[in-house]
Amino acid sequence: MRLVLLGPPGSGKGTQAARLKDTFQIPHISTGDLLRAEVAAGSPLGLKAKEVMARGDLVSDEILLGMLEARLGQADVANGFILDGYPRNVAQANALDSLLSKIGQPLDAVVQLDVASELLVERIAGRAKAEGREDDNPESVRKRLQVYTDSTAPVIGFYEQRGKLARVDGVGSLDEVLERIGQALGR
């Protein structure tokens, strides 16, 4: 199973990806985790990324794709993988499709976790309070959600046009959402 999980901040992507990893016995790949690991390892791509981040710039799609290509070349992804939160824009979606085609591992499905914006604000604000983070105030969360909507809505359409998209209601208990994802994937 080669799967992408999409959803706005607070939708439960990371939580469900961890659960799907256990269910399908395939690795959960987060580009954020990849980036941190490459920087920590001091790899050539990690050093490039560190330099970019030190300037306060965003890591380029090219660097992210290079890291992803290296990760997808590892033995543990032979039976599939779960990509969490990537691609975030249509350029990344096209690049990912090209990469997966090149290595003969096309996506099986893309799951979009749908959660109403106001509930997302509540979830993130609650999580921020529990973790003592003051930067996740409702206004900044709304801005992050708007950025997500602006950049990711076209990605949803991209995969919908290719017949790969499954929309799943992300509201409910962890087990209920996992069950819905399983049903959407025909499991």
From Swiss-Prot:
Chain segments annotated as transmembrane: none
Spans annotated as NMP: 30-59
Residue ranges, annotated region (LID): 126-136
GO annotation, cellular component aspect: cytoplasm
Signal peptide: none
CDD domains found in the cross-reference section: ADK
Residues involved in ATP binding: G10, S11, G12, K13, G14, T15, R127, G172
GO terms, biological process: AMP salvage
Subunit structure: Monomer.
Notes concerning its domains: Consists of three domains, a large central CORE domain and two small peripheral domains, NMPbind and LID, which undergo movements during catalysis. The LID domain closes over the site of phosphoryl transfer upon ATP binding. Assembling and dissambling the active center during each catalytic cycle provides an effective means to prevent ATP hydrolysis.
Protein name: Adenylate kinase
Taxonomic lineage from the root: Bacteria, Pseudomonadati, Pseudomonadota, Gammaproteobacteria, Lysobacterales
Gene it is expressed from: adk
